[in-house]
Amino acid sequence: MSNFDNFNTDFYQTSYSIDDQSQGYNYNAGGAQHSKQYAYDPYSQQGGFIPPEMMNQQQPYTGQIYQPTQTYTPAATDSVYGSTFDDEPPLLEELGINFDHIWQKTLTVLHPLKVADGNIMNETDLAGPMVFCLAFGATLLLAGKIQFGYVYGISAIGCLGMYCLLNLMSMTGVSFGCVSSVLGYCLLPMIILSSFAVIFSLQGILGIVLAALIIGWCSFSASKIFISALAMDGQQVLVAYPCALLYGVFALISVF
């Protein structure tokens, strides 16, 4: 028994009294203290207490329903887009279409004796050539000849051949777009020949003479522009010969 008494004395702390067990225990108070001790308080994490009256307080809306308040200032267009629309170039300029240059190139082809501007002719402009190719095919269609495939195919092969030939002959070199542009603009006299084919038949002496004049007109204009743009002085005849072969094929399509 003495050992058992010593065990009880060692088990309990010296400040603990068995008589305290007889006192009543308030579960509600203890539970409230326990929940208060371990409850999560979101406002304590922010470092301060916010009174309830400040949480319920709202700023009154002083503006009207369909009108913003005076303090609202919309963002400027410059800050959103970086620059105004007035500073942007026109759409035709971004696409590389210049009607002034197109008109000057057309006049250069229509006037074979006019001096060509090498700076303008060296540009890659395919808007005018596409229009002239469509016009040439349309006039052939009016004459009862559906030859759009031949027109585009011969044009592509001719441009490729002239591109290779001019790069071999010139010192500066030339781009494929420049060759296509010049040959396309010089197709304009051939549209006149196909327009005559709509009115009367070209299978005769008059048609052959007219076709020869148109071929010489086209080849002379194309060679003049190539000589001016590529600085190939004294080589116009050498350039005009392959051009005459190309436009001769178009003349055969128009006549026959």
Curated annotation (Swiss-Prot):
Residue ranges, Cytoplasmic side: 1-125, 169-172, 217-235
Transmembrane segments annotated in the record for this chain: 126-146, 148-168, 173-193, 196-216, 236-256
Lumenal side: 147, 194-195
Major place of residence: endoplasmic reticulum
Compartment(s) of residence: Endoplasmic reticulum membrane; Golgi apparatus, cis-Golgi network membrane
Keywords, alphabetical: Endoplasmic reticulum, ER-Golgi transport, Golgi apparatus, Membrane, Protein transport, Transmembrane, Transmembrane helix, Transport
Membrane topology according to the record: Multi-pass membrane protein
Pfam families referenced in this protein's UniProt entry, alphabetically: Yip1
Superkingdom: Eukaryota
Keyword Transmembrane in annotation: yes
GO cellular component: endoplasmic reticulum membrane; Golgi apparatus
GO biological process, alphabetically ordered: endoplasmic reticulum to Golgi vesicle-mediated transport; protein transport
Family to which this protein belongs: Belongs to the YIP1 family.
Function, in words: Plays a role in transport between endoplasmic reticulum and Golgi.
Record-given protein name: Protein YIPF5
